[in-house]
């Protein structure tokens, strides 16, 4: 499984997804940013981001886990551990 993306690649991918879903510049999508407080992403957009991340990275993000992904870094770590 050497094709596993690096955390930087996951972050870049999430940045592209967030841009598509919420119109936020990928440059603003950094590991320390809160989806809600810093990037102004609502719960409906978070579900769409999760669906696209599942498709892109081949992971499953259950609703109860999605609620725990407060920051971009949380999402990167979750994807990295579950890929």
Feature names for model-found ranges:
Residues 2-27, 82:
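Thiotemplate assembly-line natural product biosynthesis machinery
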Residues 25, 60-62:
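Short coil/turn motifs that cap or connect alpha-helices
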Residues 28, 32-39:
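N-terminal helix-turn-helix DNA-binding core of bacterial DNA-binding proteins
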Residues 45:
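Two-component histidine kinase catalytic core, primarily the HATPase_c
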Residues 64-73:
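AMP-binding/adenylate-forming catalytic domain of the ANL superfamily
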Residues 77-83:
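Short hydrophobic/aromatic patches at helix-to-coil boundaries
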């Amino acid at each position: 499984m050497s094709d596993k993306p690096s955390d930087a690649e996951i972050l870049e991918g999430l940045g592209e997804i967030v841009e598509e879903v919420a119109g936020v510049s990928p440059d603003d999508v950094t590991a320390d940013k809160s989806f809600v407080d810093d990037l102004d992403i609502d719960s409906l957009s978070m579900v769409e981001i999760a669906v696209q991340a599942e498709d892109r990275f081949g992971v499953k993000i259950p609703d109860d886990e999605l609620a725990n992904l407060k920051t971009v870094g949380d999402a990167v770590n979750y994807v990295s551990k579950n890929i």
